[in-house]
From Swiss-Prot:
GO molecular function: ATP binding; carbamoyl-phosphate synthase (ammonia) activity; carbamoyl-phosphate synthase (glutamine-hydrolyzing) activity; metal ion binding
Ligand binding (Mg(2+) 4): 851, 853
Named cofactor requirement(s): Mg(2+); Mn(2+)
Annotated residues for binding of Mg(2+) 3: 839, 851
Residue span of region Allosteric domain: 953-1093
Name of the protein in question: Carbamoyl phosphate synthase large chain
Residues involved in Mn(2+) 3 binding: 839, 851
Enzyme Commission number(s) from the entry: 6.3.4.16, 6.3.5.5
Cofactor: record remark: Binds 4 Mg(2+) or Mn(2+) ions per subunit.
Gene Ontology CC: cytoplasm
Keywords from the named record: Amino-acid biosynthesis, Arginine biosynthesis, ATP-binding, Ligase, Magnesium, Manganese, Metal-binding, Nucleotide-binding, Pyrimidine biosynthesis, Repeat
Segments for region (Oligomerization domain): 413-560
């Protein structure tokens, strides 16, 4: 069937901010879909609230709306677009594609249909029909559908109250699994082992489910879990793209499981039965066009197979299957949605076979999740049906062993394999209960002499996987006995074929530091043991592959032919994590696009399956490899073996490539852009302090310390409060504001493991300062300031966790001039080539430099979207020797910033509190947000309100505000309270705060603090009497009392504001939303006339 010519315009719904359970994979799928639809000649309109995505780049759609993903805003966008279509005189149809934006887009599509909005504007849903979405997503309808086609499902009941849930659980017996309907990443789900746990989880699940219902399901804990990625077209052709096996058993969310493709432990007969079942599911649910994933559980004792669930959309597993096979699922799903059939679409990798050929792979792929519980003290680390990982890595090897070991070293835990802190007495508990360190305990169990059978019994992992892990452990032990001087080339080759790194071998032989690793490398290369590169080609080498997509292995035949083009290798940012997210991937992609346009061969190195950077057509050559010194050097040597000229970019991938920069340069790699020495100078406390003195630029008083005594003496000299942190970290990892000596000594005892032989930094903390972020471009001669962003939270809250606004709203002109002056001086003194990010604190109109990062920062995508100038593209061109005068001559001549026209752009962070209900929500110098959103309007208040709405904080337009502010903030309290009273709010306050308000003649109801008596403030929150909380904590004493308030607020989903500055911004936002109807503007219109390509 050819493409549908009756459709003229297609709205693609994005997935919004990055949250746990919905990550960068939807930027990758949305980008592919937009490109495919635009290439087919459709008018493409995109809506998404996340500025850090490639899909929101203005060139990917005809109109791009960065707006909140709510029914109200989509109604307005659909109205405008439907009117434009009607006015154009075209009789073409208007369609919405909701299957590439994750759960967010699907839920929105259902809401728009149910509210009659799609019918109102004559809009058709494509990619998935409404009844198919409902059948797959509604637990009861799905269960009935499976029963109708004769497939087994776990016994279950759909409940909408706790009594029915208890009744059913008692009937089928504990434990039971609780799964809320229409939620993402298993939000609100859990395992109830008894009545109390069931009641607690069910109450939370019913609250989080948009339709207030949960499925209570018979436990299949310990069963094996499989997924099939399936595609179907309108002619009923169905193909299986990939089978995926979870190494962890049922009971752990698939996003938190180690997964392997293709499935390793199925017999052919079992696989065929599962394949047949998946085809039946697709047809019964009615997914006519596009990709879905179907999840199965198999009882290892009896072989009973049950269907667990299906997603009628492109999912996290689709991204993995896509990268594992080279088959562009999202692109093909978009083409199927507009009427093509699989046999009409060519396979982009081979360019000889159609898409209806099922991919075949002759290698093994392993995905391992990345968790960051260290960011959330108090969070429950046990893994269950609710997803908790923040990112993932993928590795490809010729065997399972090789791909597992490569994936483990891609994780960048900062801890060496073999150096984990293990507690022998907790071995049994750690094997039985799934948690992030479980694999380390499995290896430890084998070192302690436990058998595969015993470990399989405790972990419910398939013995096949455990035998593989035991073989790796045994090989490492044997090679350790062989010593460095006596090891044979055969033993060494065997270890390398298993994926064991040089660093691990050095450790086994007791060779320390970088020199030890270099010795192993020399020995290995002396024996001629070097990696070769194999192709990912979708067809197990049966056809020629046209796209160079490689992975390393220690075999004989190399499939990566050398080229003699001028090339640039871009080091990616590895797994998504807090502090280093999709923003850095965005910069890497832009570098690849610009370099390709300029005639360079762009080579990408990364190991994250969720991102656009690892898409087969982003760069000219893609190496899916770990970002370690060994792996990166091997690629560089391979690419330059024939004498080809290759530069390497390290400033776009966040901290990961920067940590390798100096060692790469010492090994002879040509690093382009800002030199590793300059990067080091900016990070090194003493040298940087000297530079600031020479330039006469003030910074907060600071010192360094390597012991508790030194730290206490320094803090005393500088004066409390102090900011204590390790050197060389990203995302404010392990930072704290200390108000007294006890806090400093506690920190020093905790922090030493992060310092990597580098000292702890102690700074005077500037209280009540306004923080400012600056992004600038520099070519060594000229500097152009891209944006001066004013933070809405005060200094001391990590810049990644603070909302910020461009242009700055209330900084004095002379302060802005000082910031510009300091920025230019520092960029030129540090010899920056490319991007630089500076952070300033302004206290009583005096400007202090907090830090300078001569690299791309997480604000680059946001500033690029706000100014219409692709900063990362220009920066990568500067690195190849081009000059700013070619791109921004007017700004150089006038000295002006890039500017944002007549609009305000507010960036707000998004937090994962609902996944970690036990964690305190107060913000500080350590970053905790997982993603970001942007609000755009012609006034600050509306832009802030939009950003808050996109981040999931719905500011109330009326009701009661609870105030509890510390003594220091009481001066600002009265005018703030008046603002809220003028907006029509009532005020409730704690005793001290209420007294201040009464004195000023403001009416406020007084309420008990948590420890003072009942009914206290937490009772009011739980009784839904409070609509907004303004609670500014200070120091340790008040901290615990307020933790209870903030926790209760998270559970009741009441917006909580912890700084006076943000409370003022919220008041402006509420005023804007009370004032007028909503406005929406596409980026293309905002930047018409001044965008730079």
């Amino acid at each position: 069937m050819p493409r549908r010519n009756d459709i003229r315009k297609i709205l693609v719904i994005g997935s919004g901010p990055i949250v746990i359970g919905q990550s960068a994979e939807f930027d990758y799928s949305g980008t592919q879909a937009c490109k495919a639809l635009k290439a087919e000649g459709y008018e493409v309109v995109l809506v998404n609230s996340n500025p850090a995505t490639i899909m929101t780049d203005p060139e990917l759609a005809d109109r791009t709306y960065i707006e909140p993903l709510t029914v109200k805003y989509l109604d307005e966008i659909l109205r405008i677009e439907a009117e434009m279509l009607a006015a154009s005189g075209s009789n073409g149809k208007f369609a919405v594609l909701p299957t590439v934006g994750g759960q967010t887009a699907l839920n929105l599509a259902v809401e728009l249909a149910d509210a009659g909005i799609l019918d109102k504007y004559g809009v058709e849903l494509i990619g998935a029909k409404l009844d198919a979405i409902k059948k797959a997503e509604d637990r009861l309808l799905f269960k009935d559908a499976m029963t109708r086609i004769g497939l087994d499902v776990p016994r279950s009941a759909l409940v909408n109250n706790i009594r029915d849930g208890l009744e059913f659980a008692t009937k089928i017996g504990f434990p039971v699994i609780i799964r809320p309907s229409f939620t993402l990443g298993g939000s609100g789900g859990g395992i109830g082992y008894n009545r109390e746990e069931l009641m607690e989880i069910l109450a939370r699940g019913l609250d989080l489910s948009p339709v207030h219902e949960c499925l209570i399901e018979e436990s299949v804990l310990g069963w094996k879990e499989y997924e099939l990625e399936v595609m179907r077209d309108l002619a009923d052709n169905v193909i299986i793209i990939c089978s995926i096996e979870n190494m962890d058993p049922m009971g752990v969310h698939t996003g938190d499981s180690i997964t392997v493709a293709p499935a390793q432990t199925l017999t052919d007969r079992e696989y065929q039965a599962m394949r047949d079942a998946a085809l039946l599911v697709m047809r019964e649910i009615g997914v006519e066009t596009g990709g879905s994933n179907v999840q199965f559980a198999v009882n290892p004792q009896t072989g009973r197979m049950t269907v667990i669930e299906m997603n009628p959309r492109v999912s996290r597993s689709s991204a993995l299957a896509s990268k594992a096979t080279g088959f562009p699922i999202a692109k093909i799903a978009a083409k199927l949605a507009v009427g093509y059939t699989l046999d009409e679409i060519p396979n982009d990798i081979t360019r000889m076979t159609p898409a209806c050929f099922e991919p075949t792979i002759d290698y093994v792929v392993t995905k391992i999740p990345k968790w960051q519980f260290e960011k959330f003290p108090g969070a429950d680390e046990n893994l269950g049906p609710q997803m908790k990982s923040v990112g993932e890595v993928m590795a490809i090897g010729r065997t399972f062993k090789e791909s597992l070991m490569k994936a483990l070293r891609s994780l960048e835990t900062g801890k060496r394999v073999g150096a984990e802190v293990l507690e022998p007495r907790r071995l049994t508990q750690r094997l039985v209960t799934p948690q992030p360190e479980r694999l380390n305990y499995v290896r430890f169990a084998f070192r302690q002499g436990l058998s595969v059978r015993e470990v399989a019994r405790m972990t419910s992992m398939d013995p096949w996987f455990l035998y593989q892990i035991k073989e790796i452990t045994d090989t490492i032990a044997a090679i350790g006995d062989a010593t460095f001087d006596n090891v044979s080339p055969e033993q060494l080759r065997k270890a390398k074929r298993m994926g064991i790194s040089d660093e691990r071998l050095a450790e086994v032989w007791g060779l320390t530091g970088n020199e030890g690793v270099a010795k192993v490398r020399e020995l290995r290369q002396g024996h001629g043991i070097r990696p070769i590169y194999k192709l990912v080609d979708t067809c197990a080498a049966e056809f020629e592959s046209a796209t160079p997509y490689f992975y390393s292995s220690y075999e004989e035949e190399d499939e990566a032919p050398q080229t003699d083009k001028r090339k640039v290798i871009i080091l990616g940012s590895g797994p998504n994590r807090i502090g280093q997210g999709i923003e850095f991937d965005y910069c890497c992609c832009h570098a690849a696009f610009a370099l390709k346009e300029d005639g360079f061969e762009a080579i990408m190195v990364n190991c994250n399956p969720e991102t656009v950077s690892t898409d087969y057509d982003t760069s000219d050559r893609l190496y899916f490899e770990p970002l370690t010194l060994e792996d990166v050097l091997a690629i560089y040597e391979h690419e330059t073996a024939n004498g080809a000229d290759a530069g390497m970019i390290v400033q776009f991938g966040g901290q990961t490539p920067l940590n390798l920069a100096l060692r790469l340069k010492q090994a002879g790699v040509k690093i382009i852009g800002t030199s590793p020495e300059s990067i080091d100078l900016a990070e090194d406390r003493k040298s940087f302090g000297k530079l600031l003195e020479q330039l006469q630029i003030p910074q907060p008083q600071g010192a360094t310390a390597t012991s508790v005594e030194e730290a206490l003496a320094s803090a005393e000299r500088i004066g409390y409060p102090v900011l204590v942190r390790p050197s060389y970290v990203l995302g404010g990892r392990a930072m704290v504001i200390a108000y007294d000596a006890a806090a400093v000594s506690h920190y020093m005892k905790e922090a030493v493991e992060y310092s990597q032989e580098r000292p702890i930094l102690i700074d005077h903390f500037l209280e009540d300062a306004v923080e400012v972020d600056v992004d600038a471009l520099c070519d060594g001669t000229d500097v152009v300031i891209a944006g001066i962003m004013q933070h809405i939270e005060e200094a001391g809250i990590h810049s990644g966790d603070s909302s910020c606004v461009l242009p700055a709203v209330d900084l004095a002109p002379q302060v802005l001039d000082t910031i510009r002056d300091y920025t230019r001086k520092l960029a030129l003194s540090l010899k920056v080539i490319g991007l630089v990010n500076l952070q300033f604190a302004i206290q009583r109109d005096k400007v202090y430099v907090i830090e300078v990062n001569p690299r791309a920062s997480r604000t680059v995508p946001y500033v690029s979207k706000a100014t219409g100038v692709p900063l990362a593209k220009i920066a990568s061109r500067l690195m190849t020797g081009r000059k700013l005068s070619e791109f921004l001559p007017e700004n150089i001549a006038s000295g002006k910033d890039l500017g944002t026209g007549a609009h305000y752009y507010v960036k707000s962070p998004v937090f994962p509190w609902n996944k970690f209900p036990g964690v305190d929500t107060v913000l500080g110098p350590e970053m905790k947000s997982t993603g970001e959103v942007m609000g755009v309007a012609d006034n600050f208040g509306e832009a802030f309100a939009k950003a808050q709405l996109s981040a999931g904080l719905i500011l109330p337009s009326s009701g009661t505000v609870f105030f509890s502010v510390n003594d220091h903030d009481k001066a600002a309290l009265v005018p703030l309270a008046k603002q809220y009273i003028d907006l029509g709010f009532q005020i409730v306050a704690t005793e001290g705060t209420a007294k201040v308000l009464h004195k000023a003649g403001i009416q406020a109801e007084s309420v008990y603090k948590v420890k003072e008596g009942r009914p206290n403030i937490v009772d009011l929150i739980k009784g839904q009497r409070i609509q907004l909380i303004i609670n500014t904590p200070r120091g340790q004493d008040t901290f615990f009392d307020e933790q209870a308030i903030r926790r209760a607020a998270v559970l009741q989903r009441i917006p909580t504001i912890t700084t006076i500055a943000a409370a003022r911004a919220a008041a402006e936002g509420i005023a804007a939303s009370q004032r007028k109807h909503i406005t929406v503007n596409p980026l293309q219109l905002l930047h018409a006339g001044h965008a730079v390509k």
